[in-house]
Protein backbone atom coordinates (compact mmCIF):
# COMPACT_ATOMS: atom_id res chain seq x y z
CA UNK A 1 0.00 0.00 0.00
CA UNK A 2 2.85 2.35 0.82
CA UNK A 3 4.48 1.69 -2.56
CA UNK A 4 1.18 2.34 -4.33
CA UNK A 5 0.78 5.71 -2.60
CA UNK A 6 4.35 6.71 -3.50
CA UNK A 7 3.77 5.79 -7.14
CA UNK A 8 0.57 7.81 -7.20
CA UNK A 9 2.43 10.83 -5.83
CA UNK A 10 5.08 10.48 -8.54
CA UNK A 11 2.39 10.38 -11.21
CA UNK A 12 0.85 13.68 -10.11
CA UNK A 13 3.65 16.25 -10.07
CA UNK A 14 6.30 17.26 -12.59
CA UNK A 15 8.86 19.78 -11.38
CA UNK A 16 8.52 23.13 -13.19
CA UNK A 17 12.32 23.56 -13.22
CA UNK A 18 12.88 20.20 -14.93
CA UNK A 19 14.72 20.60 -18.24
CA UNK A 20 13.54 17.25 -19.61
CA UNK A 21 12.13 17.82 -23.11
CA UNK A 22 10.07 14.61 -23.02
CA UNK A 23 6.31 14.75 -22.79
CA UNK A 24 4.64 14.37 -19.41
CA UNK A 25 3.90 10.63 -19.70
CA UNK A 26 7.43 9.75 -20.90
CA UNK A 27 9.00 11.85 -18.17
CA UNK A 28 6.82 10.18 -15.55
CA UNK A 29 7.71 6.70 -16.84
CA UNK A 30 11.42 7.51 -16.62
CA UNK A 31 11.00 8.66 -13.02
CA UNK A 32 9.09 5.48 -12.19
CA UNK A 33 11.77 3.26 -13.72
CA UNK A 34 14.57 4.90 -11.75
CA UNK A 35 12.49 4.75 -8.60
CA UNK A 36 11.67 1.04 -9.03
CA UNK A 37 15.34 0.19 -9.53
CA UNK A 38 16.07 1.59 -6.08
CA UNK A 39 13.26 -0.09 -4.15
CA UNK A 40 12.88 -3.40 -6.04
CA UNK A 41 15.34 -6.23 -6.67
CA UNK A 42 16.09 -6.57 -10.39
CA UNK A 43 16.46 -10.37 -10.08
CA UNK A 44 13.23 -11.38 -8.30
CA UNK A 45 11.37 -8.01 -8.23
CA UNK A 46 10.84 -8.26 -4.48
CA UNK A 47 10.85 -5.14 -2.31
CA UNK A 48 14.27 -4.37 -0.90
CA UNK A 49 14.89 -3.97 2.83
CA UNK A 50 17.52 -1.31 3.60
CA UNK A 51 18.53 -1.39 -0.08
CA UNK A 52 19.19 -5.16 0.11
CA UNK A 53 17.09 -8.02 -1.19
CA UNK A 54 15.95 -10.66 1.32
CA UNK A 55 16.62 -13.42 -1.20
CA UNK A 56 20.16 -14.58 -1.93
CA UNK A 57 20.92 -14.53 -5.66
CA UNK A 58 23.84 -16.21 -7.34
CA UNK A 59 26.44 -13.93 -8.82
CA UNK A 60 25.97 -13.55 -12.56
CA UNK A 61 29.10 -14.35 -14.55
CA UNK A 62 29.90 -11.66 -17.09
CA UNK A 63 31.72 -12.90 -20.16
CA UNK A 64 34.67 -10.70 -21.12
CA UNK A 65 34.01 -8.64 -24.24
CA UNK A 66 36.57 -8.49 -27.00
CA UNK A 67 38.53 -5.24 -27.24
CA UNK A 68 39.70 -3.69 -30.52
CA UNK A 69 43.44 -3.95 -31.06
CA UNK A 70 43.50 -0.56 -32.80
CA UNK A 71 41.58 1.80 -30.51
CA UNK A 72 40.78 -0.36 -27.41
CA UNK A 73 37.04 0.13 -27.96
CA UNK A 74 34.76 -2.68 -26.71
CA UNK A 75 33.23 -4.74 -29.51
CA UNK A 76 29.48 -4.43 -30.19
CA UNK A 77 27.05 -6.50 -32.22
CA UNK A 78 26.66 -5.40 -35.83
CA UNK A 79 24.33 -6.63 -38.54
CA UNK A 80 26.05 -7.68 -41.74
CA UNK A 81 23.69 -7.99 -44.71
CA UNK A 82 24.82 -10.61 -47.23
CA UNK A 83 22.36 -10.88 -50.08
CA UNK A 84 18.62 -10.32 -50.08
CA UNK A 85 17.59 -12.72 -47.32
CA UNK A 86 20.89 -13.27 -45.53
CA UNK A 87 21.70 -11.32 -42.35
CA UNK A 88 24.64 -12.20 -40.14
CA UNK A 89 25.37 -10.87 -36.65
CA UNK A 90 29.02 -10.32 -35.76
CA UNK A 91 30.95 -8.71 -32.92
CA UNK A 92 32.88 -5.78 -34.38
CA UNK A 93 34.55 -2.58 -33.27
CA UNK A 94 32.13 0.39 -33.27
CA UNK A 95 34.72 2.29 -35.31
CA UNK A 96 35.39 1.08 -38.84
CA UNK A 97 38.99 0.05 -39.45
CA UNK A 98 38.34 -1.49 -42.87
CA UNK A 99 40.14 -0.02 -45.85
CA UNK A 100 38.12 2.58 -47.72
CA UNK A 101 36.29 1.73 -50.93
CA UNK A 102 37.70 4.67 -52.90
CA UNK A 103 41.10 6.31 -53.22
CA UNK A 104 41.24 9.53 -51.20
CA UNK A 105 43.36 11.23 -53.87
CA UNK A 106 41.72 10.38 -57.20
CA UNK A 107 38.44 8.82 -55.91
CA UNK A 108 38.96 5.67 -58.01
CA UNK A 109 37.62 2.39 -56.69
CA UNK A 110 40.04 0.41 -54.53
CA UNK A 111 40.68 -3.32 -54.89
CA UNK A 112 42.23 -4.98 -51.83
CA UNK A 113 43.30 -1.57 -50.57
CA UNK A 114 45.02 -0.59 -53.84
CA UNK A 115 44.13 2.20 -56.25
CA UNK A 116 42.98 1.04 -59.71
CA UNK A 117 44.21 4.24 -61.35
CA UNK A 118 47.80 3.55 -62.41
CA UNK A 119 48.44 7.26 -62.99
CA UNK A 120 47.75 7.96 -59.32
CA UNK A 121 50.92 7.80 -57.22
CA UNK A 122 48.83 6.97 -54.15
CA UNK A 123 48.59 3.39 -55.41
CA UNK A 124 50.01 0.64 -53.27
CA UNK A 125 51.05 2.17 -49.96
CA UNK A 126 51.20 -1.11 -48.02
CA UNK A 127 48.87 0.19 -45.31
CA UNK A 128 46.17 -2.47 -45.74
CA UNK A 129 46.21 -6.26 -45.82
CA UNK A 130 45.44 -7.55 -49.31
CA UNK A 131 43.70 -10.63 -47.92
CA UNK A 132 41.22 -9.29 -45.34
CA UNK A 133 41.35 -5.54 -46.07
CA UNK A 134 42.16 -4.51 -42.49
CA UNK A 135 44.61 -1.70 -41.84
CA UNK A 136 48.09 -2.69 -40.75
CA UNK A 137 49.20 -2.23 -37.15
CA UNK A 138 52.95 -1.77 -36.72
CA UNK A 139 53.40 -2.85 -40.34
CA UNK A 140 51.63 -6.20 -39.90
CA UNK A 141 48.12 -7.57 -40.29
CA UNK A 142 46.45 -8.26 -36.94
CA UNK A 143 44.94 -11.44 -38.43
CA UNK A 144 48.42 -12.83 -39.11
CA UNK A 145 48.24 -12.62 -42.90
CA UNK A 146 51.66 -12.41 -44.55
CA UNK A 147 51.69 -10.47 -47.81
CA UNK A 148 55.06 -11.97 -48.73
CA UNK A 149 53.29 -15.24 -49.58
CA UNK A 150 52.61 -14.60 -53.24
CA UNK A 151 52.51 -16.67 -56.38
CA UNK A 152 55.79 -16.26 -58.27
CA UNK A 153 53.96 -16.13 -61.59
CA UNK A 154 50.93 -13.87 -61.12
CA UNK A 155 51.66 -12.24 -57.74
CA UNK A 156 48.39 -13.41 -56.17
CA UNK A 157 48.57 -13.97 -52.41
CA UNK A 158 48.10 -17.51 -51.16
CA UNK A 159 46.80 -18.42 -47.71
CA UNK A 160 48.22 -21.20 -45.52
CA UNK A 161 50.36 -22.53 -48.35
CA UNK A 162 47.43 -22.91 -50.77
CA UNK A 163 47.73 -21.23 -54.17
CA UNK A 164 44.35 -19.68 -54.91
CA UNK A 165 45.40 -19.05 -58.51
CA UNK A 166 46.17 -22.72 -59.24
CA UNK A 167 49.68 -22.04 -60.53
CA UNK A 168 51.42 -24.26 -58.00
CA UNK A 169 53.30 -27.06 -59.76
CA UNK A 170 52.80 -25.42 -63.17
CA UNK A 171 55.68 -22.96 -62.94
CA UNK A 172 59.20 -23.56 -64.17
CA UNK A 173 61.70 -23.55 -61.33
CA UNK A 174 64.37 -22.00 -63.54
CA UNK A 175 62.69 -18.97 -65.09
CA UNK A 176 59.33 -18.76 -63.27
CA UNK A 177 57.38 -19.09 -66.52
CA UNK A 178 54.05 -20.88 -66.74
CA UNK A 179 54.43 -24.35 -68.21
CA UNK A 180 52.62 -25.42 -71.38
CA UNK A 181 51.38 -29.03 -71.38
CA UNK A 182 53.74 -29.80 -68.52
CA UNK A 183 56.85 -28.34 -70.21
CA UNK A 184 58.55 -24.98 -69.85
CA UNK A 185 58.61 -23.07 -73.18
CA UNK A 186 62.33 -22.40 -72.60
CA UNK A 187 63.24 -25.96 -71.69
CA UNK A 188 65.91 -26.09 -74.43
CA UNK A 189 67.62 -23.00 -73.03
CA UNK A 190 67.66 -24.56 -69.58
CA UNK A 191 69.18 -27.76 -71.02
CA UNK A 192 72.11 -25.86 -72.49
CA UNK A 193 72.88 -24.32 -69.11
CA UNK A 194 72.30 -27.22 -66.73
CA UNK A 195 72.68 -30.28 -68.99
CA UNK A 196 69.74 -32.06 -67.38
CA UNK A 197 65.97 -32.00 -67.18
CA UNK A 198 64.11 -32.40 -63.94
CA UNK A 199 61.35 -35.02 -63.86
CA UNK A 200 59.03 -32.22 -62.77
CA UNK A 201 58.91 -31.01 -66.36
CA UNK A 202 56.85 -34.04 -67.32
CA UNK A 203 53.17 -34.21 -66.51
CA UNK A 204 51.25 -37.27 -65.37
CA UNK A 205 50.72 -38.51 -68.95
CA UNK A 206 54.43 -39.31 -69.29
CA UNK A 207 56.53 -41.88 -67.51
CA UNK A 208 59.04 -40.38 -65.13
CA UNK A 209 62.41 -40.10 -66.81
CA UNK A 210 65.85 -39.05 -65.69
CA UNK A 211 67.51 -37.54 -68.74
CA UNK A 212 71.07 -36.26 -68.56
CA UNK A 213 73.32 -34.89 -71.31
CA UNK A 214 70.50 -34.52 -73.83
CA UNK A 215 72.18 -32.43 -76.52
CA UNK A 216 70.19 -34.44 -79.02
CA UNK A 217 66.95 -32.80 -77.91
CA UNK A 218 65.73 -30.00 -80.13
UniProtKB/Swiss-Prot annotation:
Highest taxon of source: Viruses
Protein name per Swiss-Prot or TrEMBL: Uncharacterized protein R661
Amino acid sequence: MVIYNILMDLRIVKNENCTDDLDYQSHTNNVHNEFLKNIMCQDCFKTKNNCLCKNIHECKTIKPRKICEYCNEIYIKKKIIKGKNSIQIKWQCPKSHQSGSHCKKCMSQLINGECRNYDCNCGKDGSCCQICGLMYKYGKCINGHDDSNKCDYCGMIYVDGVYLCGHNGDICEECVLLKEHGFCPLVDEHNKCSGEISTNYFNDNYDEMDITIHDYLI
